[in-house]
Amino acid sequence: MITYILPTRDRPERLALTLGALGNLKGHPVSSPQDPGEVLIVDNASKFPATAPEKLANGLRVRVLHRATNEGAASRNIAVQNADPRSEWVVMLDDDSYPCDTGFIRRLGKAPQDVAAVSADIYLPGMSRRESGGLPEVFIGCGVAIRRQVFLDLNGYDPAFNYYAEEYDLAARMILAGYRIAFDPWFRVEHHKVAANRDMNTILARLVRNNGWVMQRYAPADMRRAQIREQRTRYRQISQKENARRGFTEGLLELRKTIRAQKRTPMSRQLFDRFTGLSYAREALQSAYTTKPFRTVQLIDEGKNGWVIRKALAELNVTILPTPHSPLPTPDCLVIGSMSPGPMLDAFERRTLLNPAGSPQRILAPWTAITRKPAAGSDILTGGATKVA
C-alpha cells in the first residue's frame, strides 16, 4: 500500500481541492479491497484546525495530525512516524500538489533496493512550466516517493532548516548511507503553486543560510570554501533579480553566526560529484562527444549548478563561446546550462521544438535522463538509478 503525506497551514480551500484530486486517483494496489492506502495530513498549527473526511472517494483513508506549532518541513517527520507500517513507500506532497495517476506505484515496487527515493516530474500548471530546484540526485519535497524505513533510519528532515534546502540535506545523508535517488519521468505531479503573497526576503534569507549549511556539512575539505562562495554568488544574483537584498544580507549574517555549529560529515569526491550533478554532466557530455565530437559550444538557459557543466566541458577541452548575441562563429552545439531537472526538461523540449530533427543546430542536455526517456509503462527508472562511476 501507499501513504501520501502533506503538511498544511491555513489553506482549507486548497487542501480540499488536493484531497479531491487524490480521491479521484484510480488503480491503487490494494492490501485488501477496502484499503487502497492512506493520506496523512499534518496541520502546522492552523488558526482554524484543518478538517478532512475519514475516507476519500476511492477509499483512501485520511488522518489529520494536529501540531501545536508550525514545524515547517520537519512536520513530515511525525507523519512518517505515524504511517501505516505496511507502506514501504511514503509519497511526499504539499497541500497544493498531487500525482496525475497511480502508474508510478507499480514502478516503485520494482525499484532496486539501493534506491531510497524517486523524484517526480513536477508541473506548475498555473505558470506553464516545471518546478525549479533540485538536481539529478536531489529531490523536491512536493513530489517525491521515499522508502519509509530509510526515512526513519536517517531521522527524516532536520528541523533546523524549517523550509528550503532541507531536501538537499536529506539527499546528502541518503548518498552517504549508500543509497541513490532516481527519477521517474512518468511519475507526474501537478503543483498548483501560487506566486502571490510570498515574502522573498524571508525565502532568500533561508536559502542563503540553509544552502550554506549543506555545503559546510557535506562538501569535501578542499571544495568547502569554494562551494559556499558559489552558493553566496548565486543567491546574491537572485536577490538582486527579486529585489530581496535585505533577505540576502540577513541570511548571510545568520550563516556566519551558525556555520561553525554545523557538524562536518564530508563526502568523498566521488559522492560529491553525484550530489552536485557533475557525474551526470560528465556522463551525458562525454557520451554526446563520443557519438559526434564537438569543439565549441554556447551555454543556453543557464541555471543551478551551471559550474558543473562548465567543468565537464573543460575536461573535454571544449571551448565555451560567449552568448548567442555575439558576432562570433556559430558553435558546434548548444548546451543547456542548468542541472535542475525541471528547467532542463523545459529548455530541452522548447529548444528541440524550435530546432526539429534535421536542423543544423545540435542541442545537448547535460543529463542522459532527459534524452533517454523510457517508454510509457516501462519499469525503468532513470537519473540516479543509473550507477555512475
What are these model-predicted stretches?
Residues 64-85:
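Glycine-rich, basic loop-to-helix element that forms the pyrophosphate-binding segment
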Residues 224-288, 292-293:
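Non-catalytic, C-terminal membrane-associated alpha-helical segments of glycosyltransferases
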Residues 21, 40-52, 97-98:
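A conserved acidic beta->alpha catalytic loop
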Residues 97-131:
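Conserved donor NDP-sugar-binding/catalytic core segment of glycosyltransferases
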Residues 143-146, 150-155, 160-188:
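A short, conserved alpha-helix in the catalytic core of glycosyltransferases
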Residues 87-98:
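Short beta-strand-to-loop acidic/aromatic patch adjacent to the donor-nucleotide binding site
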Residues 11-32:
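Short, well-formed alpha-helical segments that are part of the catalytic scaffolds
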Residues 177-179, 184-202, 213-214:
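Active-site donor/metal-binding and catalytic loop motifs
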